[in-house]
Amino acid sequence: MKIFNVLFFVLLAVVARAADNPYNETADAKLEIKQTLTQAAVTQTPIIIVFGANWCGDCKMLDSAMKSGASATLLSRDFKIVKVNVGRFDTNVDLARSYGVPLAKGIPAVAIISPKNEIIYVTQDGELANARQMGDNGIYEFHKRVTAWSKAKK
């Protein structure tokens, strides 16, 4: 019985930890982007690609704000979202580079692309790398500016 309890709590801890990880470390990011581009072409909706990692507190803060903060309604209405794991800057780096995302400036980093896979906007100076200090309101203001800017570029 003691072994069962230990195994149960270990399994519970693993499941809880996985729930806190917004970036799928085993996902095929290129395939996810390709599939999202297909969906976006139907609705003519731009795509936000968020490059981040599960060890990054600012990445987790941004993810939380995008799911439940003031940004959530704005983003779900105007964008499709793909999250790309960059690990310890050793995963999907080529993909970030292909969208002009300078990971060295910090993560999370964002690229906004059209349904035709054309770059609309890229964070260039680590604009979201201090998401914890920005808080929900600062993240919302950033998304509001980027949304307006991306609509103007259409």
Where are these regions (language model features)?
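Sec-dependent signal peptide recognition
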Residues: 2-9
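Hydrophobic h-region of N-terminal signal peptides that target proteins for export
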Residues: 9-17
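Cleaved targeting-peptide boundary
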Residues: 18-25
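A short beta-strand-turn-helix
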Residues: 25-46
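Thiol-based oxidoreductase modules, predominantly thioredoxin-like and allied folds used
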Residues: 27, 72-93
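Short active-site neighborhood of thiol/selenol oxidoreductases, capturing the structured segment around
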Residues: 43-56
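Typically the conserved alpha-helix immediately C-terminal to a functionally engaged Cys/Sec
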Residues: 60-74
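Non-catalytic, surface beta->alpha helical segment in thiol-disulfide oxidoreductase systems
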Residues: 105-153
